[in-house]
């Protein structure tokens, strides 16, 4: 009797525990299975938490329950969940730490630039006035070479005037104008006329001021005769072969003359068979290229191999960019061309500052030519933006200029670029499916700045900083800025 009561009490306790934790009633049938001779227990559902659905509705529920009911499997799943939460927590802490480190690097770079500015201002105040005036006089002497002219015999001048030149001189009676033919595109025709006359004048200027070389000996007899006419009886003193000085003189005195409406209307490239090799190539490319868009000018520029000609074309394009139409949104290829111009002008301070001013000055109209726009609903007009690659190339150029130890101070430009990155960065969603967002920098005008930047949320800013903190080029440039201050102190 005691054994039966003990069995009943154990069965009762088991039934209560099962019902307590699983809300399921168990009924033990008193029949035995034929194989194992053990009582068979049937379970009935009464709103249980785990077994609240029968097997017909979810056929895999019983298998899932058996899997989790095993102690080893439950421990394995729990361990994986804990490990996953630990990895997520660690990754979050690392991301926050890198974001803070990047912000601290930007602040350290700005503080470093401020200290350098104070030191330079103190040094400038302590310099005597005569040293500054002497430096300005040296610049004037360097930029404007002296040319001494010797008086020629009037008979010699008259004979020289009668000699032939590479460009045949025509009288009014020799010209036969076809009035029915009109210029198909005035801007492209003007660009061709301007580029041709500029490079033709530069080739003469180059051959006149420099000593005779093997390249000049290979020129045609007509071209050498033209050079001799320009140098005969004249003695050149203190002249320097500076491209920027030549371009300023040509642009100021001759560009408007050779590109007057009448001359542009009737402009045709002359017979260039007697020209030097470089000028022959230029004339051939100008003839084959329509030169109507900036993309076509990019093709023309990319085929040129002479660094001198590329510098002249870079100076010319900055002053004549109005000849090419502006795209409103799709300017990806134009921004690539801007990067090429910046990269080619790294060794030329003046050209680099010209093109960097397009980014530094938001009112520069050339931003609409080179950079794609972002439609901003807050101001209801497009806003130009630059890529992170373009930004890093500009910042690198100014840091290189500052590290060369030149007499000019570029701390203000570097400081402004850091502020632009810190305030104007935003995320641009990539149209490709598997590509993440990219960081771009807005270039708003002062009157639109607060409205446009107000649309960028703090969460988007933090995401931008996270991406920037992982960009090796940006982090390395910020470190170089801090190192400049450390070396100077």
Swiss-Prot record:
GO terms for cellular component: mitochondrial inner membrane; mitochondrion. Keywords: Activator, Membrane, Mitochondrion, Mitochondrion inner membrane, Translation regulation. Its main location: mitochondrion. Present with 450 molecules/cell in log phase SD medium. It is a peripheral membrane protein. The keyword Cytoplasm does not apply. It comes from Saccharomyces cerevisiae (strain ATCC 204508 / S288c) (Baker's yeast). One of its GO terms (biological process) is positive regulation of mitochondrial translation. This is COX3 mRNA-specific translational activator PET494. It is found in: Mitochondrion inner membrane. GO terms for molecular function: translation regulator activity. The gene is PET494. Required for the expression of the mitochondrial gene for cytochrome c oxidase subunit III (COX3).
